Amino acid sequence: MLALDSSRQQQTSYFQDVHMDPALVDPFGFQMDNLGGFGQTSGPTSAPTSYYGTSPVYADSQLEPKTSAFPPMPPTPPSLPVPYSTEPYMSGLSSASGPSIASASSSAIGSPYSCTAHTFPESWVDTNHGIGLPAAVMDEFFPNEFMGSSLEADHTYQRKGPDDFVEHSNFSANCGFFLQSPDQSHLPVAENYSADHLSQTGLAVSSPMPNSGPHSRSVSIYDRRSSISSTNSRRSQLSPAASVADFDEESKEKGRCPHPDCGRVFKDLKAHMLTHQSERPEKCPIVTCEYHVKGFARKYDKNRHTLTHYKGTMVCGFCPGSGSPAEKSFNRADVFKRHLTSVHGVEQTPPNCRKRSPGASSVKKVSDYCQDATGKCSTCSATFSNAQDFYEHLDDCVLRVVQQVEPSEVINQQRLAEVDCDEEVKKTMEKHKLLDAAGDVDDEPEEDDDDYNELNLQLRSSKGAFKSNKANSSLGSRPIMGNHNAVTKNGKARATISKRRNNRDRYPPSWGCPSSSMKTKKRVLCVFDGQRRLWKDEMMLDNEFEVRLKLPGGAGDGTNREAYITDLDVETLKRAEGVLSANEDEKGPWLEGPATHFMGQPAKMLPALSHTHEDVDIDDLMS
């Protein structure tokens, strides 16, 4: 293999007798007779002490005879420019020759070692003979079993299969030869290739100084096709899927809550951080609500909760039958808003953002919905041309009504305060372990949709199931009297049926109440004189015969909200007024005990009853 002379000044250059003539242009016209003299002298004993401190690493006797006849030729031009080549600098080389045959700067063939050309064509494949021609052409002149220069510390190109030379691992670890770093001042430096640029483009800048430690064989790259273009290929771009994945990971880390006890990921991290405040600034305007004390972190959540306190009927002015018994009515604002979104195509406006530009729903007119659509707000009697404008108006309108203090609410507060201060009530509460403690209430209102009339089984807290109890912790251990005085212990909150008004015509078929027969309304009339009940009766009327009457004074709560009453209610009140407005002669004397006859003069004479406690058969009387 490669051996060095006694001094660097006595080294023989690659081109001793060959001059730069046009014959180099034609690879097949190249004179191969003098190639034996191109190599360096093979005297290993004449190497200077600065290069070898021990016996030579490679011996010529370890190679096959046919390989020893040829000098070591540089392999395919390396991927690095000349300034970063792993070949040691030799003073005998001229600046025109370069470290390889094809790198002559004055030749007609363009050299791939030129500093201005940083990419190599595909024709520069691994040929093992350094000329840059395919192995099929140069196979008759150069054997393919050639091993690279011993000074290539990186082992860039390796043969596939068993090698015919001794591996590095067979030598001792203290082979201890050191190469002197080449003087970079003699070599041309590329302007655009710095160490930083090479590190960014993925090209490793390797020092020509091999490691003095144990040599390990590098991994062979012959498992795939190797080429200069693949070695010097630029850094591949990330695929769109990988870019999206990296972006998602980056956005997920940005949205992660920094609170040590939380650590969850939120889209709106700024809004979530408000929930970690010690005090929630937004309070519910209803004094009796426990969120008047707890509060909310965001105004949007407070307004959404306040809408649940609305007590009234909201009529959709964009559905058919508005103003008639067939109108679509709601008793909850959130359910009404879902109806506008799902049925009338209203676009929801996200919180803390601007209103959207007018769309198709904002251009529609009232007549486009249905023939009898009014577009009227049942709360404030305002008229709107489309459902989108009414949807944006609904929150402010309902919140204004809810936040108004009703006169009856003031009276209720006074009465409740008197009960809270009563000592007897406190003793009773303590006796039954009903402490005045606020229970946990979910921030989200329960899902309720009048479009689907179903019986929802929900696990509610004891405060929701039993409104008279103010704590749910004590119910878990309280014994409950069941049927036939059987004592059972309630360990968990019992499942209660949340029944809405529109569910009253959806009873199970086994009850014998088909929905077709559920068309009547029942009015129960109870007339009292102080604590004495004077009258109680029931009246049934089919919905088809019910007539709605508009109250002239409205709802009477200080707003312009319209209110309605049926003709049956009017007739029922007339009967009550007839009883209460009767004089003493018309009422007659008050009889203690159960009554044996109807009030007033009967239309039919009653049979004589021997005993006052006997029951009266109503069917016999009415027959």
From Swiss-Prot:
Keywords: Metal-binding, Nucleus, Transcription, Transcription regulation, Zinc, Zinc-finger. InterPro entries: Zinc_finger_trans_reg, Znf_C2H2_sf, Znf_C2H2_type. It is found in: Nucleus. Residues 227-239 have a biased composition (Low complexity). Disruption phenotype: Leads to decreased hyphal growth, azole susceptibility, and attenuated animal virulence. Results in the marked up-regulation of a series of drug efflux pump-encoding genes, especially atrF, which contributes to azole drug resistance. Transmembrane segments: none annotated. GO terms for biological process: regulation of transcription by RNA polymerase II. One of its GO terms (cellular component) is nucleus. One of its GO terms (molecular function) is zinc ion binding. The keyword Ribonucleoprotein does not apply. Residues 202-219 have a biased composition (Polar residues). It comes from the Eukaryota. A zinc finger (C2H2-type) spans 255-276. Residues 202-256, 468-493 are annotated as: Disordered. Transcription factor involved in fungal growth and virulence potential. Negatively regulates antifungal drug susceptibility via transcriptional inhibition of the expressions of drug efflux pumps in a crzA-dependent way. Under the treatment of azoles, both zfpA and crzA transfer to nuclei and coregulate the expression of multidrug transporters and then keep normal drug susceptibility in fungal cells. PANTHER family: C2H2-TYPE DOMAIN-CONTAINING PROTEIN, ZINC FINGER PROTEIN. This is C2H2-type transcription factor zfpA. It comes from Aspergillus fumigatus (strain CBS 144.89 / FGSC A1163 / CEA10) (Neosartorya fumigata). The lineage of its organism: Eukaryota, Fungi, Dikarya, Ascomycota, Pezizomycotina.
